[in-house]
Each structure stands twice: as structure tokens, then as C-alpha cells.
């Protein structure tokens, strides 16, 4: 999973989130209100800025377009942007409005009050022109566009129409985090990501179970002229109602559950969803696969306090723990099951690695090779010789451990995601079916001699050799045991 070459243009309401932490120990003598004694403060990018921050922390590049004022908040916001190398500052400064700033006052991690410093004036024609020019300058560099609409004025109907028009001309998908009740303003977008409350309000009907979510989505899809709808459903996960495509007359429906966890803060979870969705789709994944990745990403950030982001390592770890990772089950899978896993993993943009062997008596050399292989890929498949295959290769006294035992031990390793058996002397047939992205063997081989290497390379993959741990072998262990008896 590598987003380093993916660029996303993010336009919307950029703001600064400030947090004032303290304690409440008394009531004011001036009025019946608590007195908050401030002990610490911090600030971070908010709104569309948080969307861009999520993209950057996942390894992508965000082109951030929005309006800021000529004030101290703008200076603080620019300072934050300078600290995030993955964000390109394409903000427009306006003398007609303040930089949006939301300040939260907290005691014992509970909000006491929030203040909003913002303008309620509609976007001026001159501001719209500057925003449109900035978008036109950068849009062709990007693989996706995000409209982060917080309803604060930047995304006026004129700006939305202009941006979507430019994107469609360039064949660039557009993702919308909506705030408006009328989704017709987003006509031409690729995917809109309302939560169920926003979806219900836009469709003017309930959206509290799968059937009603689908019905509501059909209504707003007509308003938005065929945009797909990704409905976020809190603890129920997500539902993607995908617009009809070539070869399909009706919508396609995909669901993914949320993994049970302790939720600390849902602030900014929607920003993470749309950032990951757009980034994953721009990198080549289908909308369904991008939804599954964004669902995992949202699961990470809601377990953190405050407006949070995540990095690729955290996302990989969450995929490992979630149902979509489909890790090993403690025994060998059939070739058909392994092929299905590989297909799903590749749809998620994961790099699939492969190695093989007898693994008769698991030793430090085996574990070292498997651990190193797993660091070079996102998922590792280990193909294991059956007992008959081992006997043909090693002699009638082998294997020491039976096939099921060997597979169970391997499947119990954290570095191994799938174990599959093969009856032949080589794993060529397995490799030809699975077509892994990486084929790993010990450095005692030459690349040109690795079985299946030509098949993997022809499919665009690589053969990689891994250094062995000296003096470690099953044969050596067997000989040592024989001297003791």
C-alpha cells in the first residue's frame, strides 16, 4: 500500500481548531457559570485542512485550496501547514473575512463551551474567481478532487459547478463531503459521503436500516445526477450504493461492518473517511475496495482523542485486525481460497508476497526468512510441500512432522497470512494461479533458478533473495538429534 505518487486536490472550508484544556473548581461570582482555569492549549488543522492532513499522513500529497483572512489565525494556520510536507499550500487570502477558528474549552476532557470565529457573508465574486483560478492551476496534477463542504461559504454553487466541470473535463473523480440538503448542487460528482443523518435530511425520509438507507440513497442519487453514495453509519459501518456502470443497469450495493472498539472521539472521522476514500481510489482501487480501506481508517481515528489522523503503518495494522484482512486460520487453505484472498488483497492495494518450502522442523533460519519477507510485502503466503512431496525430495524418513502439523505451526506465526499446500515437487502451479507481487527465496539460490520467477516477472512482479541465518537447517537438526540417541 503506497500512496506516495498520489496527489489529491482538496477544496473547502479551511479552519483552525484550538483546544483550551483546564479545570473547573468554582462558579463565577459574576454569573452562574463555571470558571475554567486554563492549564494547556494546542491547535491543529481543521475542516478541509484536516482532510489534507489525513492525505499527507497516509503518504499522499494534498493540494489545499480555500479561503483565509489576513489575521493572526491565518499566521498560525500557515505555520501548521509548513510542518506537514505532504500539503501544498494553495490558499487564497481574503481581506473580507476572518480565518475560521473553532475554539473548544475542555475540563476533564469534556467540552464546557465552544466559540466559533467565522464570517456569515456569502463568498464574493472576486473570491470565487481566485478560488477557481487556483483550482484550474493545480487540478490536472491530481488523481482525485475532494469537496470538503462545511457550509461556511467557500463552496458556493458557482465554485462547486466550476470545480466539478473542470474535473469531468479532465476525467478526474470528484468526492464530496456534503453539508447542503439539496444534493443537486453536487451534480456530476463521482461519490458523495453523507452520514445517515445527512442522508435522511437530504432525502426527506428516514435512513435507519439498510432498506431505508438504500431508498434514501436512490432519491439523492437522482438529485446528484447519478453520483454514488457512501453512507457512513457509525457503529454499523458503511454502505456504498454504487451508481449504474457500463454493463450494469442498476445500482450495486456493498456493505462493510465496523469493528467493535472503544470510541474516544468521533471528531474528524468524516474527514478521514473522504481523505482515505479519494486517496485509495486515485491510486487505482475500485470504489468498493476504497470504501473498505476508509472504513478501517475511520476505525483507527475514532479510537484517538481529538481531531486525529493516521499513517500507513496504523492503517495496515488495522487491516490486519479487521475482517477484511482474512488472515490465517491455523491450517492450510485450499488453492481456491488462497486465490480469493489474493484477489481481495490486491483489490485493497496490498502487496502480496510468496515463499515456499518443506518447513519440516521450524527453526530460527525459517523464522528469520519469513519475518524479513513479511517486511517487504503487505501479505505473505507460504506454500508447503505435502508429506508425499517431502518424501520424494528428502527421502523416506522425512518428513519428521506431518503436513497438518507443519501448516498449523506456520499459520501461527505473525509473519504468515496464508498457508497453502502443494503435492508436486515444485510450487510452480500454485505460483501460476496466485501470481504474487513478490517471490521470496533464500540467498543460496540464484534469481534465474527460482521456480516460478519467470511467471511472477511476466505478471509485473519481482523475485527477491533473502540472506540466510548461517548454520541453521532441518537436516542439521535431524543429524544432531540422531547423535543423541
Curated annotation (Swiss-Prot):
It is an enzyme of class 2 (transferase). GO terms for cellular component: cytosol. Residues 354-485 are annotated as: Cytidylyltransferase. Residues 1-326 are annotated as: Ribokinase. InterPro entries: Bifunc_HldE, Carboh/pur_kinase_PfkB_CS, Cyt_trans-like, PfkB_dom, RfaE_dom_I, RfaE_dom_II, Ribokinase-like, Rossmann-like_a/b/a_fold. Keywords: ATP-binding, Carbohydrate metabolism, Kinase, Multifunctional enzyme, Nucleotide-binding, Nucleotidyltransferase, Transferase. Pfam families: CTP_transf_like, PfkB. ATP binds at residues 195-198. Gene3D superfamilies: 3.40.1190.20, HUPs (3.40.50.620). Pathway: Nucleotide-sugar biosynthesis; ADP-L-glycero-beta-D-manno-heptose biosynthesis; ADP-L-glycero-beta-D-manno-heptose from D-glycero-beta-D-manno-heptose 7-phosphate: step 1/4; Nucleotide-sugar biosynthesis; ADP-L-glycero-beta-D-manno-heptose biosynthesis; ADP-L-glycero-beta-D-manno-heptose from D-glycero-beta-D-manno-heptose 7-phosphate: step 3/4. The active site is at residue 271. One of its GO terms (biological process) is ADP-L-glycero-beta-D-manno-heptose biosynthetic process. One of its GO terms (molecular function) is ATP binding. It catalyses: D-glycero-beta-D-manno-heptose 7-phosphate + ATP = D-glycero-beta-D-manno-heptose 1,7-bisphosphate + ADP + H(+); D-glycero-beta-D-manno-heptose 1-phosphate + ATP + H(+) = ADP-D-glycero-beta-D-manno-heptose + diphosphate. Its EC number is 2.7.1.167, 2.7.7.70. Catalyzes the ADP transfer from ATP to D-glycero-beta-D-manno-heptose 1-phosphate, yielding ADP-D-glycero-beta-D-manno-heptose. Homodimer. In the N-terminal section; belongs to the carbohydrate kinase PfkB family. In the C-terminal section; belongs to the cytidylyltransferase family. PANTHER family: BIFUNCTIONAL PROTEIN HLDE. This is Bifunctional protein HldE. It comes from Granulibacter bethesdensis (strain ATCC BAA-1260 / CGDNIH1).
